[in-house]
Each structure stands twice: as structure tokens, then as C-alpha cells.
Amino acid sequence: MKPTGYFLIKSGHLIDAAQDWDFRSDVLIKNGEITVSGCNIDEDSLEQGFTTIDASGLVVSPGFIDIHAHLREPGFEYKETIASGTKAAAKGGFTTISCMPNTDPPIDNVSVVNFIHDRARSDGVVRVLPIGCVTKGRLGKELADMEEMASACLLYTSDAADD
């Protein structure tokens, strides 16, 4: 899900450790890509159709990653869904979350991994990386089929506690 739009973020405190950025700056973003950064970008020099965001006194940074989220779906949708959990993550500045396998059924096979991916694509607003179970049912007795889950792009495993 590639972001779209044309935004000029004015006067924000730009922080990006990967780029060694820590200064006040304007940032021009087009379709999810930073195209220009610098002080006092001239709005008159830009093509039409951008939205200006006043970030005075605010921090501008790349999206955060939550490596330990509990989305509760499937099985506990009365607590949270992939849609509601990813919306909350986005509101907090997170662009990627890893969801723990303490669902019902647990994320211990390829069909549940695929369910998470499919639901995240259809209902989610941030990237979701499911964390699969180390053992079937999170019971600690028999290893889950990690090779099968990896074939569905599963990157991590854990037999996470319930909360």
C-alpha cells in the first residue's frame, strides 16, 4: 500500500537517525517519497495540488515499528481487530507492526498466516508482519511447521504469553 498525495511539511524538527538528520526543516513529500528537504521551501515554486502542514514545534520522522503488538484477530475480535489495531498504530506514528501469535486459532500454520496477511491488506492501514508460533497451539510440545509458514512470508516466531 503505497501512500499517495503531495504534502509540504513546514518548519518541523526533522529527525532521522539513518540519515543523521536532527534539525529544523521543511519537507516535500510526493506519493510517499521525500523529494526535497531544506529550510524555507518556496511554495510558489511548487506545482499545484499540494497540502501544507504546519509542523512548528512538532517532530517529523520516519514511521515507527512496533515489534510486539497484539491485534487479537482471529478469535478475539471483541477486544480488537486488525482494522482497529492498525488504525491505532497509525495514529501513534507506527507504519509497521508485528502481531503476536496469541490469537484463536494461534498463528501456527500457513492458513492463519495467510489470513493475517489478507486481512491486513484489505482492512489494515499500516504494514502488518505476523509472528508465528514456535510450537503448535503455543503449547510447547510439538514444533510448528516453520518452513511452511516461512513460505507465506512469515519472518519471526514466538510462543508469546497471553498478554
Where are these regions (language model features)?
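Active-site beta->alpha loop and helix N-cap motifs at the rims of alpha/beta catalytic domains
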Residues: T135-L139
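A generic structural signal for alpha->beta connector loops
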Residues: G49, F94, V125-R127
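Metal-associated gating/positioning segment near the N- to mid-region
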Residues: S56-D123
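Conserved small/polar residues in nucleotide/adenosyl-binding loops
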Residues: Y156-D163
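Histidine/acidic residue-rich metal-binding segments in metalloenzymes
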Residues: A144-L154
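Histidine-rich, glycine-flanked metal-binding segment
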Residues: K2-P62
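Hydrophobic faces of well-ordered beta-strands that scaffold small-molecule active sites
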Residues: I65-I67, I97, L129-G132, Y156
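Conserved residues at the C-terminal ends of beta-strands
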Residues: I15, M100, V134
